Amino acid sequence: MVDSRQEHIKLGTYPPEQVYQVLQTSPQGLSSQEVKERQATYGPNQLKESKKEPIWLTFFRHFTSLMALLLWGGGFIAMLSHSLELGIAIWLVNIINGLFSFIQEYRASQATAALNKLLPSYARVLRDGKEDKILAQDLVPGDLVFIEEGDRISADGRLVAVTDLQVNQSALTGESNPIYKSDQADLTPDKTELEYDNMVFAGTTVSSGSGHFIVSAIGMKTEFGQIADLTQNLAQEKSPLQKELDHLTKQISVIAVSVGLFFMVAATLFVHQPLSQAFIFALGMIVAFIPEGLLPTVTLSLAMAVQRMAKDHALVKKLSSVETLGATSVICSDKTGTLTQNAMTVNHLWTLSDSYEVTGLGYASEGQIEQEGRPISLEDNELLNRLVRFSHLASNAQVVAPSADNPNFTILGDPTEACLNVLAEKAGINLNDNHTWAPRLKEIPFDSDRKRMTTVHKLELGLDGSQHISITKGAPKEVMELCSDYYDNQGMIKSLTATERQAILAANDQFARDGLRVLAVAYRPLDSEHIGEDKWDMQTLEDNMVFLGLVAMSDSPRQGVREAIEKCHRASIRIIMVTGDYGLTALSIAKKIGIVQGDDARVVSGLELAGMDDNQLKEALKGEIVFARVAPEQKYRVVNALQELGEVVAVTGDGVNDAPALKKADIGVAMGVSGTDVAKESADMILTDDHFASIVHAVEEGRAVYRNIQKFLTYIFNSNTPEAVPSAFFLFSLGRIPLPLTVMQILAIDLGTDMMPALGLGVEPPEEGVMDRPPRRLSDRLLNRQLLIKAFVWYGLIEAALAMGAFFLNYWVNQGNLNHLASSGPLYREATTMTLGAIIFTQIGMAMNSRKGRGSIFQVKPFANRIISLGIVLEIVLFIILTYVPFFHTLFNTAPIGLDDWLYLLACPFVIMALEEIRYRLFDKK
């Protein structure tokens, strides 16, 4: 077996005879003894899976994260506080979250299994001079393997014989056009392994023709195996949101435990409470600071965003990926199928007399031939008629229309030829009638050395005085050299002079600069002395041909892509094209759709990238850049370099070759239509329409999710201050002021009235202008200084003042003074009920304040968010139940309140909304 990449590349430079020597085999194949020895040396032709964490440990890990432990503790505290149902509910939320996370991680680990599915089960080999069908896993280096149309190739190898062989290497390169294969030595310098036409690779498929090759690499040594090795050995990084939640729970834990210990010690030393009561009191304070609804709210917010994204053709496999999209600063996008249609379309027709545009996109036959916007009919233009008809006659591809089983066009054959069929249909030609008019008698297939193909047709009605013609299509320069004449727009055949030849080459060069693929079409009327199978040799059929014109085609940009890229630029998101296509084509498309905006953009080929060290690559990544003809590990390397520069990277891909980069990226995006199972398993998100614009919609949702989590945190932490301040009054008055808010009342707020509005804030739609701001920095915190000041100081102190005002006002109204405040009985319970009610009703106003984001309260549509509206109704209903149903009076230390008290409570939300609007107009609006 060839061990090094460099030795493998050298195989492409050897003639077939030398390949047998290098790989120590013969045209009769290996002997049985040699096979046994090599199986012992090299092992089976299989992809190996690296050792993984036991499934039970993975399962257990999802229930012991810091936030999970906080929730287990919160549930336990609730049970200690005589609230068994609430404690069980918290634990159920924890179990559901843990199970969901485990399932997501388990599914994401199946990429290697999907890779194995792409390898065939059997192979046809020559051993001991006899053909045999064996298990593909039993192949060894040196085996002589037969392949034909439809076969999936089972190992890497060097071709030693071919017959019209074409191989689809899209699984490795991402480019869907079949590659014409050769068995001849290729001495072209500076080629990568995948660029050698005389090499074949495991996991690719034979599109047409046949051949046989000598196995040079098996299992993990193949290109396929190296991709598998890269893919499965990548450590699964935590998403930015997961890292943030870990950081947040640590902060909350420190705050909660510190406050709890402080109040327990203070209650014991200064108020002389028994240690058991002080402990329960401290537990209540810890509960006040633990956001029990954090995980379910985050999960719901992400899940609702996932639902909205699904409507925009983006299926998210991993919930935390939604927010990661919101932090994305760079998108590394493939070209074919994502930015472009993945459908070759004829855009221009050129003759020595005129040039024409062709409208329509993709393989649909809607469109027409135009000249300066005016439709052109073939009936009035014989030159154009011949160019279009003959292009189709020399095509072997078929376009299968969408059906109930397959909603997309299916191409049988070469996509370059398929678009010639579509061109003919746009021109009004019936394809079957065209074949009937000029049935094919012979074909000289396309050859990568000749760069053209030729067909022979019989015309019953005749053409130019002959009933037989040959048609040649291929590379313009090669076809032009076969021509002695050209056909003009007057129906005349004229001599092709140096002037016309220069014009043809100039037109071809211009099309190439525009990123178009160009075919030239020519024909030759065959006179009677050249009729007959024995006379149709290449020299005869391709001699003294008549030049018709050029057909220029491209994989056109998708509709809406340019607008999506402009949106990314406004949002300060860079787009970097990383493609397997050629540099000029890639740069042309990049300019056309706005990825590249300057004239000094750099195109880096895979070969050039291989010569760069990491520092040079990072420096190159700072400017406008397009990567072309890159290998799988190079795409991975580009992603890694960007991450080391501090970028949050999203990567799109559809092939097996994209799997390592998809897994390495912060967010991997696979194509749902054209993508392989391997790409889909490796990705975090799947685009059901393969459209780049869908990623941009997803980024918008991701940004909204982060803002929604901040809104939710602001909302729930607002009530922490008014929950803690009453306890401070109790402690600092040395018990002379009775406890204005009990532990059970704190639990009623945190696990009851606050939950539904908080969940509603988690599903707010994206704010206006969310894509006009740069992505958040990774150093930005969910619980940042601004949020802490806003929640605990500004909003918190307002709520605390309103809550304590309600408490003291109740005593003042009912007792006439604030001396000797009762610490038990109906008056005390009524006062604590007012404290509880003031916090609940102020939180209603806070729900509206949180919804407004960076704008004015008057911009908020009060009933647009149904969950918040329902939550407000439910918290009012819950407060009424706690206040007026006698069963709850003892448990929650509540009592009925009067109409005057209700007027105070109903004013609370409007007070906090008014104060926030004043603050906004004085500070934020400016």
For the regions a protein language model found, what residue spans apply to each?
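Conserved cytosolic headpiece of P-type ATPases
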Residues: 1-775, 779-783, 797, 836, ...
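Alpha-helical transmembrane segments of multi-pass integral membrane proteins
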Residues: 791-806, 841
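A C-terminal functional module that forms or caps the active site or interfaces directly
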Residues: 850
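Membrane-helix interface motif
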Residues: 804-818, 884-889
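Membrane-water interface at loop-to-transmembrane-helix junctions
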Residues: 779-797, 825-834
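Helix-coil boundary and interhelical linker segments in multi-pass alpha-helical membrane proteins
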Residues: 731-742, 809-830
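Generic alpha-helical transmembrane segments
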Residues: 753, 830-847
